[in-house]
Curated annotation (Swiss-Prot):
Lineage start: Eukaryota, Metazoa, Spiralia, Lophotrochozoa, Mollusca
Protein name: Conotoxin BtIIIA
Keywords, ordered alphabetically: Disulfide bond, Neurotoxin, Secreted, Toxin
Chain coiled-coil ranges: none
Disulfide bonding pattern of the chain: C1-C13, C2-C9, C6-C12
Superkingdom of source: Eukaryota
Source organism per UniProt: Conus betulinus (Beech cone)
Length: 14
């Protein structure tokens, strides 16, 4: 779970 620029647990940094 990456929450850098996302509000929910999304693969935004994966």
């Amino acid at each position: 779970c990456c929450k850098q620029s996302c509000t929910t647990c999304m693969p935004c940094c994966w």
